[in-house]
Amino acid sequence: MLPAYLSNPFAAVFGGGKPIDGGRTYKDGRRILGDGKTYRGLFSGIFCGFIAGCIEIWLSSRGFEIMGINMPVFGPDYKSALIVVLALASGALFGDMFKSFFKRRMGLKRGASLPLVDQLDFVVGAWVFTYLVAPEWFVSNFTHGIMLTVIIITPLLHLTTNIIGYLIGVKKEPW
């Protein structure tokens, strides 16, 4: 999950510039995504998440472990592993954009809180993209127990990182 976990904060850190929706509105008159979703954020977030995954692949190939736990293996070979890592990183940001689209439809402004949805949108996006490109890998690695753990721990991690982002001035709201 590290590629997914890291793509969002790095998109916020390195984002800015031209919005993905180009300032356009949907048929309801509201912005499609809003100013918070930019090309620079999208590509830098995917890149940073992908690099984090590549580091994990490298560490795993060398038998690295943390507290007796082996690093994840993202696929049977490097090509498959790179595809999974890219799916995790990009799926996270597309999940976040999907959520933003629906928040705009609900009339919620940029930064408005939508509890649990704000914390799990990128997880769902990462899982969907990963399942689409590597269903066998996904099913064998994201067991019910792992998924439940991710669903429980992610909101806590999300809140912590958002508070840090708020304190250092990267985010305008601490959620």
Swiss-Prot record:
Pathway field: Membrane lipid metabolism; glycerophospholipid metabolism
Primary enzyme class: transferase
Leader sequence segment: none
Keyword rRNA-binding: no
Localization (cell): Cell membrane
Summary of the function given for this chain in its UniProt record: Catalyzes the formation of CDP-2,3-bis-(O-geranylgeranyl)-sn-glycerol (CDP-archaeol) from 2,3-bis-(O-geranylgeranyl)-sn-glycerol 1-phosphate (DGGGP) and CTP. This reaction is the third ether-bond-formation step in the biosynthesis of archaeal membrane lipids.
PANTHER family cross-referenced by the UniProt entry: CDP-ARCHAEOL SYNTHASE
Protein name: CDP-archaeol synthase
Organism: Methanosarcina barkeri (strain Fusaro / DSM 804)
